[in-house]
């Protein structure tokens, strides 16, 4: 029967188990000594693996509680009590001696013995069945633990394999008819793993010193079986006969020499092939590396693409840039920075990081691939020199250039007419205004070089266009000075001169003509937009909000009306 020490120990362990499971011990209720004794007796009669028998044990415990006017136990409380009681028995089993029935480490505690219908801790001194710590000699704690583990788990197997072993070895093994074994077998399914690991150990029967049937009929695991079979198949080789005639030996020597020659030739060929393959592999690696550099972001997964495919406007991009400047990387870490920006924009931090990487990817120029570089080298070798020719373009080409300037679209070169067909046209069609003649003279001087899709356009690098851009810039600087004069006159409440406005408009038209030669961009060049900002700043203080709209990219749509308020000044 259990005593107060054992039940106090169990109650403390069970209270700690409640704290681990539920983070508090509010649902814990202590077990008294009579209640635990009834539970230990019921563990001998019923099996915990079967739910119906577990309910019977619970009924016996609750029947005692009803007789003593105590609160009934639940099935969950019984499960936790079983778990705690099993751990307690396992600890006591580890303290048992491998040579005697029990072991007392403390020297005065209570050894575990079997009897009295249940397993309990009996009161008594260190004498009798108990062994004091002084009798252990030089055994340390770790040595005692290993000794106990070996004897409890492998002693039966060693005895069954040893042919000279007798029943004397088995007499030293402690009795297995204790309640601990009964409880470990009849345990709740929640704790079935530890029971299976203990119950799967083979039991030795030493009748007539024969090996048990379990060891003989134990199957080989599949992994070890396949390993042994493969090893036997690889090691079995057919050997030639030991003895042989001289002719056969000579023939074998000749065959060996021929085989060696053939092998040398094949080895040389294989070496050459390997060198070629290595070169090809190096080229492929270079291609892969260049492709990886070109695709700096790499392949995105489906989730990232889904985030990037969400609607994203110019205002959102501006908000993102403002938020990035508001939360600089010098003051925020990457994680906290994305979190703060995501709060500003109302999107997830991952989406912010993807948009930021997308911005960086647009800023980084992509390098040409290896194939494009090879094509450029071949074209440069075929046509190493560049020639400058001044030719008069046909009428249709001039029209196509004018259409490109107005619409921003290109036409294929096949649409251009040949010189012979253009010469047959009437001379009336070839007559042009001064505006057309100026455009033809500007576009007549061209440089013919090898076509290259990856390099920038020729127009951007030609000296004529550079001169045009410089002239357009000078016109815009003049406009800035003229607009300053208009601003000062408006601030002084005086009417500005009409000649200044006409000069501003003429300068704008000339700058558009000069910068309209850009073929790569459909949009208007960025230089005249300075004028747009200046004019908007002038009219913003004197006009209504309905008129405060961005100016059109075409000057003809600006609708600037110039009134001749001072004709005398024009005459002067």
UniProtKB/Swiss-Prot annotation:
Where is the sequence biased in composition, kind Polar residues?
Answer: 196-211
UniProt cross-references to SUPFAM superfamilies, sorted A to Z: Homeodomain-like
Q: Where is the Myb-like domain?
A: 311-360
Region Disordered, residue ranges? 196-283, 367-456
Question: Where in the sequence does UniProt note compositional bias of the Basic and acidic residues kind?
Answer: 426-435
| Official protein name in the record | Myb-like protein Y
- Tell me which domain of life the UniProt entry assigns to the organism this sequence originates from: Eukaryota
User: Compositional bias (Low complexity) at which positions?
Assistant: 222-237, 260-281, 371-392, 414-425, 436-455
Identify the CDD domains for this entry.
SANT (cd00167)
